[in-house]
Amino acid sequence: MFDSNHEQELSKRRTFAIISHPDAGKTTITEKMLFFGKVIRVPGTIKGRGSGKYAKSDWMNIEKERGISITTSVMQFTYKNILMNLLDTPGHQDFSEDTYRILTAVDCCLVVIDAAKGIEERTRKLMDVARIHNTPIITFINKLDRDSRDPIEILDEIEKELKLHCIPISWPISCGKNFRGVYHIYDKIIHLYKSKFRKNFLTLDSFLDGSLNEYLGADLSIHIRQELELIMNVYSKFNKEKFLKGITTPIFFGSALGNFGIDHLLDSLIKWAPSPLYRQSNKRIIKPQERKFTGFIFKIQANMDLKHRDRIAFMRIVSGQYTKGMKLTHVRIKKNIIISDAFSFLAGERISINKAYPGDVIGLHNHGTIKIGDTFTQGEEIKFIGIPSFAPEIFRLIYLKNPLKQKQLKKGLVQLSEEGTVQVFRPILNNDLILGAIGILQFDVVIERLRIEYNIDAVYKKVNIVLARWINYGNHHSLYNLKKSYSSYLAYDISNSLIYLAPSSANLNIVMSQNSDISFNATREQ
């Protein structure tokens, strides 16, 4: 049954991801948001091995041991009567392509930047993916209570490297040990950081009439007035339409560890982030207001519960609404199934649900039939597009210490591959198993999970591969010629798509020039 309050449910939902480079403070921000959403009572920080205290969003065993985020957690909380669907992506330098795919399931991104370091490598790569969909970006410049770069310098870097026009919403009053707070340009309020006075904020009147000297001192008061005058003359005013098109980014400053500025971010998500957006299918645009249910799978996690050895498929609802016990069509395999046990998430915890709406992320039990990119509908034969696989950047040959466990190894690798941890390739000329990943840590994750979850001891050998490109060919004669000349470089991935594994960029360029009627692609649609 379709709710009459469907539009209202849409208007009070925000689905967003937090992305950053390692150690920019993303997990601390996540926890503080959960604190504001009253999901956790006391915000904590990630602790090292043996401390026994870990971030709420870091629930996998290896994450707890190493004190880093290497998977993607989905969390739902309410803030000021708005339902927030937060997808917490790994912040560690070496994460999987699963992180990239998460960005296809959100309507907005919060980018966290370390004020001392500015734009870093992983932030650039994640922004390249976000830009494919023109995802709206809100930027938080963190750690102002530590030694920092000049704020204007950071904004210049954002505009140059991320190709976003910066719109400062708040502005810092000094930094490091002298950090006194921020001036909210649009609310015209000065928020004081760890004020020695009873007031936590000052109105614009006190900013103008000189009484600010009492709180900041005469020299700093004069400096911040001059700086703000410059900022408000140089940078444009906030325009929501340009923000929603991914042209501009509102800028906030603060300290997540000091619990300062997080409420400003949440308020901006409520005011400016879009409610659930439409998605493109292979046949038409699907709007969230439509009555019929549609959704797509963007992530699979194997063995979230070791006691049950289960596999969970994460589905983003696009249109209609989920109701417990409803019948859905699994389009790829053309099979109707009844969904009676979907649930929502709080990190590793599951909460059974009776209803869910567009923008929500729900979990489905998966017995091996659901794959990343699968579409579910109420009968319509469509497929959502824009959920790609990305070519790995690092490669290893994996083999067993005990060759008798080859069957278990293949099963474990299939599951880990289907959830996006690594990609598995089978050379067409031999029985080797080659793994490909975005970051080196993923290989450690695979070895650890094979040992803990499948009781398999495996090791790696280096392999002479530096690039991978999926092959699309127009006719079988072209493919025959390629296989005839370069069969030793060809392999199949887990979906039996042909891929070229190049030992060097020069080799790839030569092969491409000799086979101009074949396309070599860095991404593959699921």
Curated annotation (Swiss-Prot):
Gene3D superfamilies recorded: P-loop containing nucleotide triphosphate hydrolases, Peptide chain release factor 3, domain III, Translation factors
What Gene Ontology molecular function terms does this protein carry?
GTP binding; GTPase activity; guanosine tetraphosphate binding; translation release factor activity, codon nonspecific; translation release factor activity, codon specific
UniProt-listed InterPro entries? EF-G-like_DII, EFG_III/V, G_TR_CS, P-loop_NTPase, PrfC, RF3_C, RF3_dom_3_sf, RF3_GTP-bd
What are the protein's UniProt keywords?
Cytoplasm, GTP-binding, Nucleotide-binding, Protein biosynthesis
Which residues fall in a coiled-coil region?
A: none
- What HAMAP family does the annotation carry? Rel_fac_3
**Family according to the record:** Belongs to the TRAFAC class translation factor GTPase superfamily. Classic translation factor GTPase family. PrfC subfamily.
Instruction: Provide the function of this protein.
Output: Increases the formation of ribosomal termination complexes and stimulates activities of RF-1 and RF-2. It binds guanine nucleotides and has strong preference for UGA stop codons. It may interact directly with the ribosome. The stimulation of RF-1 and RF-2 is significantly reduced by GTP and GDP, but not by GMP.
UniProt protein name: Peptide chain release factor 3
Name of the encoding gene: prfC
